[in-house]
């Protein structure tokens, strides 16, 4: 129960006081992610230098889970190589599907606060929206 309370605090903090929810006009990778089931809608904006993500932000509206997940994700990927960011995304998706090892989950740091979402099927798409958008953006499906 103590852990669940801690995880709820993490999610609430990232939803109420997101560090990365703002515009990023000079982003060179921009992609919209939409969850039509509940109306979550984010625009992921990344600034890159070669293979490194140097800055990132998101704008949009959605439930607390989608907003917190996107904010946590950006905190994890800024400063990382694109390849490493994609690996984090793959691990996050594995965690949500209940397929990640404890070591992999620990490597997700604050994103592990979303691990129990796997038991809430209606919220899975909310949690993975930012991560799926990241994968699409880094694999060349961005809009300009």
Regions found by a protein language model. Name each.
Residues 1-25, 80-144:
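C-terminal binding/interaction regions
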Residues 17-60:
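Structured beta-strand/loop patches that form or line metal/cofactor-binding pockets in enzymes
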Residues 38, 63, 126:
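Functionally engaged cysteine thiol sites
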Residues 42, 71, 125:
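Active-site phosphate/pyrophosphate-handling residues
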Residues 61-67:
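Short, thiol/selenol-centered motifs that function as redox-active sites or metal-ligating centers
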Residues 67-68, 87:
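Alpha-helical macromolecular-interaction surfaces
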Residues 69-79:
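Alpha-helical support elements that line or immediately flank enzyme active sites
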């Amino acid at each position: 129960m103590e852990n669940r309370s801690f995880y709820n605090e993490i999610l609430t903090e990232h939803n109420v006081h997101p560090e990365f929810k703002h515009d990023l006009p000079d982003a060179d990778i921009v992609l919209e992610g939409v969850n039509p089931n509940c109306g979550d809608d984010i625009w992921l904006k990344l600034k890159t230098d070669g293979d490194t993500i140097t800055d990132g932000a998101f704008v949009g509206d959605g439930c607390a889970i989608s907003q917190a997940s996107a904010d946590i994700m950006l905190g994890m990927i800024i400063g990382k190589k694109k390849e490493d960011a994609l690996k984090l995304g793959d691990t996050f998706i594995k965690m949500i599907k209940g397929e990640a090892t404890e070591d992999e989950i620990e490597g997700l740091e604050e994103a592990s606060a979303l691990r129990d979402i796997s038991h809430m099927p209606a919220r899975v798409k909310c949690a993975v929206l930012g991560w799926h958008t990241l994968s699409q953006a880094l694999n060349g499906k961005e809009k300009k």
